[in-house]
Amino acid sequence: MIEQQFLKQCKEKAYFIEHQRVLLAISGGLDSMTLLNLLYKYQKELDIELILAHINHKQRIEADQEEKQLKEIAQKLGVKILTSSFSGVFSEKSARDFRYNFFKKVMQEEDCTALVTAHHADDQAETIFMRILRGSRLRYLSGMKDRQPFGGGELIRPLLEFSKTDFPTVFHFEDASNFENTYFRNRVRNHYFPLLETENPRIKQAIINLGTEIAQLQKALSDLTKDLNQTDLQTFRKQKREVQVFLLQEYLEKFPDLQLSKAQFDEILHILNTKANYHHYLKNQYELIQDYQTFKIQKIGPKSDSKKDAILLQFEDIIELDNFCFSFGKELVGGVVQMIPVSRKTSIVLRHRQSGDRIVLNGHHKKLARYFIDEKYSLQERDEAIIVEQFNEILGIAGIVTSDLSKNSKRDIMKDILYIKKIDR
């Protein structure tokens, strides 16, 4: 029965109308083998050509044999299959990143315009519930979308409206690790949901319905605010805070790899409402640029000679810049020039001087330009000086001076050290 429902849904939602070569992610489990059977059966009706992609995670002794069998199945079906083996330290995140990077690579090499995965309704309920437990923002409780941009094409999840109990019995591999509670998703699936189902046997559907309502609410708010210019400061500041939050969240959707914390989001909101002509470094090599009329977020470009260039240090990063080695939290041996107290709660910005820079020295704010003049630094030395900034405050200048803000032991948040070592080149 699922076959006809599946075909009907694919046609009604026009999943493949713009796609000819389709990449199917296949693990060998019941979900992906069911999807393989469905897409293979309806290739002509959907006017698609299938290509398979499989990742061998190398975590079970059966993994190599399963990869071999999948290749044999693909050969019998006359479908091309490409495989890759995971390498590195295994975790849920590292494995997921490896998979999707491989899928992007295959899509490009094989000229595929769509990646298809076998996520289903049970996965959707688990995902929403996991996000609730992690304290995700409301918009992310809408769950996975059945289609979204991916790898220059589209990611399609055509089984999201089907429960695993709807799947027919087909040849597949059973992964014994799915029954172990080492990973968060397994604990949700094997422990939390069975407990919740004793209170409400339809808890999964209730969670999915909640996600659907949230998605509808987000869509309604988006439609109601579509005529507002999100990046016009005058328009933005006229809105109530609740509307500002929504507008900023909508704008940040354009940068999926930015991943701001709530504190970082609130900091941007504060800047947009109080600052003018402002330049603020975020994370993951993004920056916020604000003038008197508008603001924008953009990726920081490759390093050049511009004084506006900046480098972001995350906790435990070690880098060499000009004539210095900077180590965030890891002690350097020998020849340490400076030790600046910092916080691991956000990144450190290394940059050159900017107009209006101020530093706290001897208990007073002092213009950086005046400090350089008083200390008789040459113009070249001023231009080459590396500013250490965190929480929008200058904490020091590499090899020159440390701000009182950083020295002040009463700032309990500054419990880590940025080590700066002079390099002889």
Swiss-Prot record:
Keywords: ATP-binding, Cytoplasm, Ligase, Nucleotide-binding, tRNA processing. Ligates lysine onto the cytidine present at position 34 of the AUA codon-specific tRNA(Ile) that contains the anticodon CAU, in an ATP-dependent manner. Cytidine is converted to lysidine, thus changing the amino acid specificity of the tRNA from methionine to isoleucine. It is an enzyme of class 6 (ligase). SUPFAM superfamilies: Adenine nucleotide alpha hydrolases-like, PheT/TilS domain. This is tRNA(Ile)-lysidine synthase. CDD domains: TilS_N (cd01992). It is found in: Cytoplasm. Belongs to the tRNA(Ile)-lysidine synthase family. GO terms for molecular function: ATP binding; tRNA(Ile)-lysidine synthase activity. GO terms for biological process: tRNA modification. It comes from Streptococcus gordonii (strain Challis / ATCC 35105 / BCRC 15272 / CH1 / DL1 / V288). It catalyses: cytidine(34) in tRNA(Ile2) + L-lysine + ATP = lysidine(34) in tRNA(Ile2) + AMP + diphosphate + H(+).
